């Protein structure tokens, strides 16, 4: 079931901005390989997103160090994976296939976490929860580095539970278990920086249990110290790059928290881990019904889970494993709030970041709801229904909705089209490419000329207008769509010239804004004397 839900309709949704960024670096390219400040036909996108052979992980890491804010291991793995698929066929599905595969593997690992922590039956319950979670399936269908770190965090929890049981149940230390725990956490740091939060939470949880139980065995503390030191030394080669990445402009897009908004946004995110019914782009009545139903289900599930947790904490056989998973999950959530209010960046507005603690959440949910009457079967049922909605693009819709933007661009398919994107950074370029890819899917069999262009607008938008006026002669009529982040509706000029021969007038009825504004201009030949 987990595999089916993750691979079903894998290429149905168009790539969005972040997935385009994944594609660029995973194909062995960088932003300097993109055709900027010139007009090119939409068909050139096939060449832009082609695999560049002969690259090493060192090359990819160098590209990421200079042009991105991510560690290299996921992208190196993706580059190797895509190399096995040469020549690329359905490249969007192939790009998303490996993250989906990591998502399936996480189902197996979370089974072992709860099997070792509790029992085989509880392990199967955790696997079932992970398999049908709309949140986990959503992450698995993204060509992004979320399922691989989630897999590694699940593995780290597996070894953490083993360590906890060795210390408090068997009074022993197995060096290989500690070594595996350290290795898995080290690898995770080279996959996603947020795995640092997971590592800190694991250390805090283990240290808290040791202090609570007044563990004075010197060998335990030495082993923990050596393990942490080994992780730190192993990550040191990339540490300075991480500090450089933390200061880049790409990390500044998150807004400051609005009072207690992060609190209720966190609760909403927990509900979305269990149930996601359509509310986006829906009639108000349908959205309201879905929202109320999700809220009622969420309240019921949380109430039953709390009752189950209380019983687990009272039972000596399950107390330590429950505390280990609960401590890890709670610690990460507290770290999130520390980041939000200390750095003034509200990360709760981005549900996908909850991948850091989702393995712990899923494991706790399964063990606390199992045996609580109809609650556990209900979680599985609403999860399956939610995943069906997800696979038909009714929930967890792609940011900036590239498929909707492409349909708006293509309202007059028989008229030649030019899409011009004003960019101030490479994220604007990636966003424009996502629109182009969605448009290419619509126009794959069309003979009507469709062109795309990216022009630098760092100084001001007038620079884009000037470059359009300097273009070579274009055929008329022409529909010109101008995409300009940060531009208000009234700031779009009434008329734009494309080359010296076409005059383009703004169509007041064709202004849209889906996270970013875009405006239609209708171009005709200028009158000549």
Describe the role of every protein-language-model region.
Residues 80, 109, 132, 136, ...:
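Specific aromatic-rich, kink-prone transmembrane helix
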Residues 97-117:
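Transmembrane-helix motifs of polytopic, lipid-linked glycan transferases
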Residues 111, 115-116, 171-172, 210-225, ...:
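Membrane-interface helix-loop-helix junctions at transmembrane boundaries of multi-pass membrane enzymes
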Residues 126-131:
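Short helix- or helix-capping micro-motifs
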Residues 141-145:
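Short acidic/glycine- and proline-prone juxtamembrane loop motifs at membrane-interface regions
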Residues 159-176, 181, 185, 197-232, ...:
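Perimembrane helix-loop-helix junctions
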Residues 323, 344-372:
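Hydrophobic/aromatic-rich transmembrane helices and adjacent perimembrane loops
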Residues 371-516:
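Catalytic lumenal/periplasmic loop and adjoining terminal transmembrane helix
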């Amino acid at each position: 079931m987990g595999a089916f839900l993750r691979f079903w309709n894998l290429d149905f949704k168009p790539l969005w901005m972040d997935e385009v960024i994944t594609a660029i670096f995973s194909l062995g390219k960088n932003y300097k390989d993109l055709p900027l400040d010139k007009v090119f036909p939409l068909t050139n996108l096939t060449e832009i997103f082609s695999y560049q052979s002969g690259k090493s992980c060192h090359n990819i890491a160098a590209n990421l160090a200079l042009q991105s804010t991510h560690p290299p291991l996921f992208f190196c793995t993706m580059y190797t994976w895509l190399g096995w698929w040469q020549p690329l066929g359905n490249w969007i599905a192939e790009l998303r296939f490996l993250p989906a595969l990591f998502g399936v593997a996480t189902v197996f690992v979370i089974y072992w976490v709860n099997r070792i922590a509790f029992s085989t039956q509880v392990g199967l319950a955790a696997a079932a929860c992970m398999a049908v979670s709309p949140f986990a399936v959503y992450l698995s269908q993204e060509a992004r580095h979320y399922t691989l770190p989630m897999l590694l965090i699940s593995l780290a929890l597996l070894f953490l539970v083993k360590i906890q049981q060795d210390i408090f149940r068997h009074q022993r230390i197995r060096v290989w278990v500690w070594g595996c725990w350290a290795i898995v956490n080290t690898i995770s740091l080279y996959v996603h920086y947020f795995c640092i939060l997971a590592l800190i939470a694991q250390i805090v949880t283990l240290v808290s249990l040791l202090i609570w139980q007044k563990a004075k065995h010197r060998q335990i503390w030495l082993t923990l110290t050596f393990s942490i030191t080994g992780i730190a030394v192993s990550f040191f080669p990339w540490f300075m790059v991480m500090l450089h990445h933390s200061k880049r402009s790409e990390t500044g897009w998150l807004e400051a928290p609005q009072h207690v908004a992060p609190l209720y946004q966190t609760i909403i995110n927990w509900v979305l881990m269990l149930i996601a019914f359509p509310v986006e782009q829906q009639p108000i009545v349908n959205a309201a019904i879905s929202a109320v139903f999700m809220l009622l289900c969420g309240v019921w599930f949380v109430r039953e889970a709390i009752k189950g947790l209380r019983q687990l904490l009272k039972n000596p056989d399950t107390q330590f494993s429950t505390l280990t998973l609960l401590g890890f999950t709670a610690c990460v959530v507290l770290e999130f709030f520390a980041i939000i209010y200390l750095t003034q960046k509200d990360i709760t507005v981005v549900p996908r970041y909850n991948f850091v603690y989702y393995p712990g959440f899923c494991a706790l949910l399964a063990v606390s709801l199992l045996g609580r009457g109809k609650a556990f079967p209900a979680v599985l049922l609403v999860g399956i229904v939610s995943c069906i909605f997800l696979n038909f693009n009714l929930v967890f819709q792609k940011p900036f909705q590239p498929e909707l933007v492409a349909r708006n661009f293509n309202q007059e398919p028989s008229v030649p089209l030019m899409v011009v994107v004003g960019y101030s950074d490479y994220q604007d370029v990636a966003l424009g490419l996502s629109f182009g890819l969605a448009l290419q899917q619509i126009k794959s069999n069309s003979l009507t000329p469709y062109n795309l262009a990216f022009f630098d607008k760092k100084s001001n938008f007038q620079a884009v207008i000037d470059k359009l006026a300097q273009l070579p002669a274009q055929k008329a009529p022409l529909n010109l769509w101008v995409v300009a982040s940060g531009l208000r509706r009234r700031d779009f000029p009434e008329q734009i010239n494309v080359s010296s021969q076409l005059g383009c007038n703004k169509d007041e009825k064709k202004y849209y804004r889906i996270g970013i504004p875009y405006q239609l201009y209708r171009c005709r030949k200028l009158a000549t004397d």
